[in-house]
Amino acid sequence: PDHACVVVHTGGTTGSPKGVMLTDNSFNAIAQQFSAYDTLFQKGQKLMNIMPPFIAYGYACGVHLPMVLGLTVVIIPNLDPAKLGSLVLKYKPEIMFGVPAHYQQLAADPKVQKKDLSFIHNYAAGGDAISLGAEKTVNEFLASHNVEYPMAKGYGMTEVASAATVAAGKNNKPGSVGIPMVNTLVSAFEPGTDKELPIGQRGELCISGPATMKGYYNKPDETAMILHKHPDGRVWVHTGDIGYIDEDGFVYLDSRIKRLIIRHDGFKVFPSMIENVVSQHPAVHQCSVVGCADKDHVQGRLPFVYIVLTRSEEHTSELQSQR
């Protein structure tokens, strides 16, 4: 059970391709952890898997997990996002795992706008961050279509077989990616160190749990860069993600360390904090914040926002006036 059963390729924390060795224990741990959340699954329900099964998220949550938990699995190969609404109406799956963009697509699909979707038990988003504005839009859509629960969310990475936290049912704070799963610890540390930070303080999110990979295939040096044994005796995965834990144990994800924008005065700007504000404007469909050169100083960068509008160019002048 502790031998590698699959090698899943990922860019990991450095961006260069590498094979993640996951074990039977890794996938079984994910299934056992999710079984503790009865608000997520109930035996006999139908799960529609729209994620590719050759990635950890798609295989662990969309193939292995439902078979272990006694769910019916409908696998959609090579999903056309434009057909997602039609597929949901055709198969009526109570459960679905996807990325935030899938649910934004579903909420905007005219084919489902006047349909009763009360058959939906839990639709979960992972694999990417979601802004507060987008989360609000999706949850308003679900509530207006008679869905009991808001969109479930989770956080993880290939190196932990896809999932480390979950926000589901009523235990779901806006903006949070949830609480650590059963037998899993998530904490914020001073980046690259084993110094744990206080509640509410931003640092590098690190994960310790039973789904952790054996390592990167034939890359011991890169394995040593991400798997660190701390003084507590636990092996922690250093994710390269910046975030914090609140007083209730909910985890909040800000951005990749590499996305952090440092101004000329050393002030750290987290792109997600700006994106969360901008995304709540009704004219904004999507936005992304990047760092650009500061022409007034020899060092440091300034945040620059790219925006996709909801309705072509009609709001451009309005947004420009609000800069």
For the regions a protein language model found, what residue spans apply to each?
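AMP-binding/adenylate-forming catalytic core of the ANL superfamily
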Residues: L89, M96, G209, K214-G215, ...
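Conserved AMP-binding/adenylation subdomain of ANL enzymes
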Residues: N28-K46, F54-F97, Q105, D109, ...
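Gly/Ser/Thr-rich phosphate-binding loop
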Residues: E94-G98, A107-P174, L185
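Short beta-strand->loop structural element characteristic of the AMP-binding/adenylate-forming
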Residues: G19-M21, N49, L71-N78, A152
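Conserved AMP-binding A3 loop
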Residues: C5-Q32, A167
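Glycine-centered tight turns that cap/initiate beta-strands
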Residues: H3, K111, F119, N183, ...
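Conserved ATP/PPi-binding loop(s) of AMP-dependent carboxylate-activating enzymes
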Residues: N172-K173, I179-N183, K195-H228, F250, ...
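Conserved pre-ATP/AMP-binding loop-to-beta segment of ANL
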Residues: P1-H9, S16, T39-K46
